[in-house]
Amino acid sequence: MKEEVSTSNQEDLVADQEVIASEESDLSPKEEKVSESTIDDDDSLNDAELQSNKQTLDNEARLEQLEKEHETLRSQYVRIAADFDNFRKRQSRDQDDLKLQLTCNTLSEILPVVDNFERARQQINPEGEEALTIHRNYQNLYKQLVDVLKKLGVAPMRVVGQSFDPTLHEALLREPSELMVEDMILEELVRGYHLNGRVLRHAQVKVSMGPGPKVDEEDKQIDEDSQADKRDEATTASNELD
């Protein structure tokens, strides 16, 4: 009886071991599959991260290249815009200079007519009512011409008694003078004109060679005494300030 029980227990133990072994055999492939799947997922994540990093680097490089191209194009645009603006200003100046030159040339042709009017006015002495009427009409015509020149910006120079300036005057004659010192203009021979501050025609003049007015000894002494008094007054005022 005891032998039968022992045999039965052994059979049960063997059966349990077989069940456990069977369960272990069933679990092992599943665990291997899970482990392999995890490794595959990790590899996929690493590949995706590497691809993302590579794409980021490519984008940054492309962005840097585009920024350089943009800066180059902007610099070219600024340079072209500046060149065009300078060209426009230069064209405007050239046009203004051309207009002024044409105006000067035209007025220079008219000025001799004005000179003839002025000479005639100085020389003609009308006698009789008819001659006086003609003279008045002639003067009115001269006045109209002068008014037109004024509207265009033409102004005559006033040179007598002024210092000679080669940028404004042309010396046709030089002679000694006791009335004016050296290089002072004695007489206007041909009138000069300005056009809006620019010399339209140089004045042709007679220039003094001196010596100028003589100073009497008495006048000279009075002048020296006056200057001495002024120096004394200045010294006194300076001392008072101190």
UniProtKB/Swiss-Prot annotation:
Annotated Gene Ontology cellular component terms: cytoplasm
Predominant cellular place of this UniProt entry's protein: cytoplasm
An annotated GO BP: protein folding
Keyword ATP-binding applies: no
Domain of life: Bacteria
Gene3D superfamilies documented for this protein: 3.90.20.20, Head domain of nucleotide exchange factor GrpE
Pfam families linked to this entry: GrpE
GO molecular function: adenyl-nucleotide exchange factor activity; protein homodimerization activity; protein-folding chaperone binding; unfolded protein binding
Subcellular location: Cytoplasm
Biased composition (Polar residues): 1-11
Signal peptide interval: none
PROSITE patterns named among the record's database cross-references: GRPE
Region (Disordered): 1-57, 208-242
Subunit structure: Homodimer.
PANTHER family hit by this protein: GRPE PROTEIN, GRPE PROTEIN HOMOLOG, MITOCHONDRIAL
Biological role: Participates actively in the response to hyperosmotic and heat shock by preventing the aggregation of stress-denatured proteins, in association with DnaK and GrpE. It is the nucleotide exchange factor for DnaK and may function as a thermosensor. Unfolded proteins bind initially to DnaJ; upon interaction with the DnaJ-bound protein, DnaK hydrolyzes its bound ATP, resulting in the formation of a stable complex. GrpE releases ADP from DnaK; ATP binding to DnaK triggers the release of the substrate protein, thus completing the reaction cycle.
Family: Belongs to the GrpE family.
Name of protein: Protein GrpE
